[in-house]
Amino acid sequence: MDIILGVVMFTLIVLALVLVILFAKSKLVPTGDITISVNGDADKAIVTQPGGKLLSALAGAGVFVSSACGGGGSCGQCRVKVKSGGGDILPTELDHITKGEAREGERLACQVAVKTDMDIELPEEIFGVKKWECTVISNDNKATFIKELKLQIPDGESVPFRAGGYIQIEAPAHHVKYADYDIPQEYREDWEKFNLFRYESKVNEETIRAYSMANYPEEHGIIMLNVRIATPPPNNPDVPPGIMSSYIWSLKEGDKCTISGPFGEFFAKDTDAEMVFIGGGAGMAPMRSHIFDQLKRLHSKRKMSFWYGARSKREMFYVEDFDGLAAENDNFVWHCALSDPLPEDNWDGYTGFIHNVLYENYLRDHEAPEDCEYYMCGPPMMNAAVIGMLKDLGVEDENILLDDFGG
């Protein structure tokens, strides 16, 4: 009898707790439709369900806000202005938003919970962002650790981007084995030397990342990316390899791939100032886009030079393209510096790190380096070294433009 009574009492207690939880949920968790007012325009208002994040609610309504980290709160790109209904700003947002900006309503859409009706402001250009399912045209090695992914836009569609812009690419859940990569023989030596074929990328959820475009606006119907494989650092080989780069490197001709865009802020200024482009690694992409756009589409007569850093000749690419541009345009020159040339390279060009080469062979004797515009994209250490050198020369922040893909 005592056992039965104990079971009954336990059951009643559990039921009571469930009722308390359900009651609390009904009071604390909103139900019904939530209306998100956008730019005070009734036609742009979004009706959604509570419980998710603002970034997802916007995407569900076909409004794609840039988020290079896929909504993790680390890139700080998904900035919107929340005029009401967003709650208090979170500590994760304050890494990217100043207190002054927060007072103005600046928030990260990926961190704002949708709980009540909201009133937000978005830049008008966001409404031009679209999503496309593209087809892989080619995916070829251009260097040991860099591939050129070329995508075909669906027939009748176009991506109205500006040179220096970027798209976001989606990777589904996947299991990629590096052993399945088709690495050309000329690059296999380093892959085997560093035992890279042992790695695998196992991902159970969709991932979104941003990549700058290497093509320029008049290369119609395609999107071209330079993608560096993100392998674990040598001193910490147990770190998982890069999710998105592993996926992109697995793509083959004919595969489907979803992108959204265009996005961007790394655009050329409309001035007559001299342009100095500095790149390294996969930072080649926006450099190619900008330089081709200036010379082939705009037929610019601005003085410009391109300084690219690589380890060896094996890591140089688009050489014929830039040689051709230099031959066709008297106002353009380009130089490559190798930091670790191989004996078989028979290299007689510049050697060393690109920031030193640029300074010693050009800017040191330039009559007014502070008047030039500097456009750069490369590994974080390169960016920091170049910026430090430019600061020492008296170049103001407004003339230093950075596509900080690795920051």
UniProtKB/Swiss-Prot annotation:
The record's family statement is: Belongs to the NqrF family.
Keyword Protein transport attributed = no
- One MF term from GO for this chain? oxidoreductase activity, acting on NAD(P)H, quinone or similar compound as acceptor
Task: Give GO cellular component annotations, separated by semicolons.
Answer: plasma membrane
Judging by the UniProt lineage, the source's domain of life is: Bacteria
Q: Which cofactor does it need?
A: [2Fe-2S] cluster; FAD
Oligomer status and interactors: Composed of six subunits; NqrA, NqrB, NqrC, NqrD, NqrE and NqrF.
Q: Which Pfam families match?
A: FAD_binding_6, Fer2, NAD_binding_1
What InterPro entries is this protein classified in?
A: 2Fe-2S_ferredoxin-like_sf, 2Fe-2S_ferredoxin-type, Beta-grasp_dom_sf, Cbr1-like_FAD-bd_dom, FAD-bd_FR_type, Flavoprot_Pyr_Nucl_cyt_Rdtase, FNR_nucleotide-bd, NqrF
Boundaries of every 2Fe-2S ferredoxin-type domain copy = 32-126
Tell me the protein's name. Na(+)-translocating NADH-quinone reductase subunit F
Gene Ontology BP terms: sodium ion transport
